[in-house]
């Protein structure tokens, strides 16, 4: 496995940078897998209409806390209602929505809390 690095006279610093990059990449991959598992296991009364199931989510962790970013795709809905003998067509178009939820703590259950917060977000913020 080779990484593109500028070679330095002191191989120790280069080696330390390489090891740190590999460790960070492995940690990010582990967090992404954990997030995907949590999304797949999430169940609530909304089913497939839950924001957790509809949104594309990413999870970031740093020294100041955790952040769950979400992106909801553009949606188009069409409804035909009969009024007497005449059909009325209602078309609704919602734009792409994105945001993030920050948690300043560093507990082991933060990801679960962030997922539950995203699930309940539809009750707090009006989405189309």
From Swiss-Prot:
Alphabetical list of InterPro entries matching this protein: Adeno_E3-15
Domain of life: Viruses
GO biological process, one term: symbiont-mediated suppression of host apoptosis
Keyword vocabulary terms for this entry: Early protein, Host-virus interaction, Inhibition of host caspases by virus, Modulation of host cell apoptosis by virus
Pfam families: Adeno_E3_15_3 (PF03307)
Signal peptide: none
Annotated S-S bridges: none
Record family assignment: Belongs to the adenoviridae E3_15 family.
Function recorded in the entry: Protects virus-infected cells from TNF-induced cytolysis.
Protein name as it appears in the record: Early E3 14.5 kDa protein
Lineage: Viruses, Varidnaviria, Bamfordvirae, Preplasmiviricota, Tectiliviricetes
